[in-house]
Amino acid sequence: MSRTVFCHYQQSDAEGLDFVPYPGELGQRIFAQIGKNAWQAWLAHQTMLINENRLSPRDPKHRAFLEAELQKFLFERNADKPEGYVAPVGD
């Protein structure tokens, strides 16, 4: 049986995540306040950020940048796309 949460990103009830997706207090907040669809939207946005900015998840500075963007994307709704980003045809 799935959990329902009030998704902060969607501002509506949504199916909750099955597990805590991120370590620490932020992970607990995501688990409690973010739905599956919003998390999938973040993963797509994160992939775009990694590719467009040539980020390495191993680099501590890049990880800090991604964490800040995660918070902006899910909780502030003001994450930006990289400068010069052009969406693929069909998006």
Swiss-Prot record:
The keyword Cytoplasm does not apply. SUPFAM superfamilies: YggX-like. Disulfide bonds: none annotated. InterPro entries: Fe_traffick_prot_YggX, Fe_traffick_prot_YggX_sf. GO terms for cellular component: cytosol. One of its GO terms (biological process) is cellular response to oxidative stress. It comes from Xanthomonas axonopodis pv. citri (strain 306). It holds the Pfam family Iron_traffic. Keywords: Iron. This is Probable Fe(2+)-trafficking protein. Could be a mediator in iron transactions between iron acquisition and iron-requiring processes, such as synthesis and/or repair of Fe-S clusters in biosynthetic enzymes. GO terms for molecular function: iron ion binding. Belongs to the Fe(2+)-trafficking protein family.
